[in-house]
Regions:
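Conserved N-terminal substructure of TIR/SEFIR domains
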Residues: 11-94, 116-118, 179-181
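Residues at the C-termini of beta-strands that transition into short coil/loop
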Residues: 67, 126, 149
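Conserved beta-strand-loop-alpha-helix hinge of the TIR/SEFIR fold
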Residues: 1, 82-133
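Residue-level detector of short, conserved catalytic/binding motifs and their immediate flanks
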Residues: 32-34, 113, 123, 143
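Conserved beta-strand scaffold positions in the cores of enzyme catalytic domains, especially
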Residues: 63, 122-124, 145-147
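C-terminal interaction surface of TIR/SEFIR-family domains
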Residues: 1-28, 44-47, 51, 55, ...
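Structural motif
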Residues: 38-40, 98-100, 149-150
């Protein structure tokens, strides 16, 4: 009996790993992915964002946008199950594309809530005619975002900051000229 207990004691970590090793294994398994949370009614604004990200090397492996073919939900998949697995299996960086349409969509508000609960990092992009004062819900209205109808210099500055965040998060090098003129 004593020798059996010694064997169990010696190997207990194999069967009951401590919480820190469980957390680190889960974190290692999660790969970064950009999730563009938007209303499908705003697709004309979302398409150029996806094109810009694709031009710098983002693929459907690390970019999700439900309204854009090749970046959305595959055929025969349950929408909510697919979205749930995206949130649980990836380290998402969320780009909220905010508008009145966004706040009128229960699906968008669900995405916002999921990102808030999971404490995902995010950037807010406000569409033309949507103001910071209109930001509501789980998105922090005091967190600096960008407005597509800001003056060109400010918008370029904010886009450059977004490029730097994405470059760091995804380990890619994107020359400024390629980013600004994509």
């Amino acid at each position: 009996l004593k020798s059996s207990l010694k064997v169990i004691e010696k190997n207990i970590d194999k069967y009951f790993p401590d919480e820190k090793s469980i957390e680190s294994e889960a974190t290692k398994a999660m790969k970064p992915k950009i999730f563009i949370s938007h209303s499908s009614k705003d697709v004309k604004y979302v398409e150029p964002i996806v094109e810009l990200l694709a031009d710098i090397g983002m693929t459907n492996d690390n970019l999700f946008c439900s309204s854009i073919p090749d970046y959305g939900i595959p055929l025969n998949q349950d929408i909510y199950e697919y979205l749930s697995s995206l949130f649980s299996e990836n380290e998402l960086y969320v780009i909220f594309v905010l508008s009145s349409n966004y706040y009128g969509s229960p699906a968008c508000l669900n995405e916002m809530g999921a990102a808030w609960v999971l404490k995902n990092e995010y950037t807010s992009i406000l569409l033309p005619k949507f103001e910071y004062q209109e930001i509501d819900g789980a998105v922090n209205p005091n967190k600096i975002g960008m407005k597509l109808d800001d003056d060109d210099e400010l918008l370029k500055k904010r886009l450059g900051e977004l490029k730097n965040i994405i470059s760091e998060k995804f380990g890619i090098s994107v020359p400024d000229m390629r980013w600004l003129y994509s």
